[in-house]
């Protein structure tokens, strides 16, 4: 299998796409996400119903706008949240992962390695930068080609930088947007909200400010 396809070719495009990612709290503080395109249409969602202890879960599920399961992200034990694996669709017993993610164990090195299993064009990616600061880049390990970026989002109408619960995921041409969002979910599980600042403005994205 070649190209940037890993999850679903519906989310691969010939031009760069900028998605708006919003962390949500449906009932409790947790790991819910909604993801919108530049027109304000829902693209992905992640729902958390586990109550106040949702961060203790070992699995996170990425769905499309219609609730179809695209990816299941599962913590690999024992790993203290440093190692995660991705499964296509809804994970079943005995199913093999399609990729693995591991955080560097070297003190002071802020990088994450993504290993893709199987016959794909690129078998390894690096995620560099600070997810907590919403400033990191996904690159092909061998070529250093950028395939996705996570950045702080600025409100187009006011030119004000939004809080870190709303940020941009920029997906390069030919790269699987569902795979990119799956990596965002893993980063959120690995790093959590440790670097998030308190008291920043929270704004729900709409078509006007996407």
From Swiss-Prot:
Might be related to the phospholipid scramblase and tubby-like superfamily of membrane tethered transcription factors. SUPFAM superfamilies: Tubby C-terminal domain-like. This is Protein LURP-one-related 5. InterPro entries: LOR, LOR_sf, Tubby-like_C. Belongs to the LOR family. Disulfide bonds: none annotated.
């Amino acid at each position: 299998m070649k190209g940037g396809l890993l999850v679903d070719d519906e989310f691969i495009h010939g031009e760069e796409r900028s998605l708006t990612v919003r962390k949500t709290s449906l009932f409790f503080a947790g790991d819910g996400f909604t993801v919108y395109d530049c027109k304000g249409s829902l693209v992905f969602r992640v729902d958390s119903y586990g109550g106040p202890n949702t961060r203790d879960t070992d699995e996170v599920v990425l769905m499309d706008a219609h609730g179809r399961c695209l990816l299941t992200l599962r913590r690999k034990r024992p790993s203290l949240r440093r190692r995660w694996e991705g499964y296509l669709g809804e994970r079943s017993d005995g199913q093999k992962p399609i990729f693995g993610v591991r955080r560097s164990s070297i003190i002071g090195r802020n990088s994450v390695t993504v290993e893709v299993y199987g016959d794909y064009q690129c078998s390894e990616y690096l995620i560099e930068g600070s997810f907590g600061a919403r400033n990191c880049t996904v690159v092909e390990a061998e070529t250093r080609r950028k395939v996705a970026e996570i950045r702080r989002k600025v409100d187009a109408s006011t030119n004000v930088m939004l809080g870190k619960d709303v940020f941009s995921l920029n997906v390069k041409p030919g790269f699987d947007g569902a795979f990119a969002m799956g990596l965002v979910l893993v980063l959120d599980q690995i790093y959590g909200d440790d670097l998030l600042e308190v008291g920043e403005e929270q704004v729900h994205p709409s078509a006007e400010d996407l």
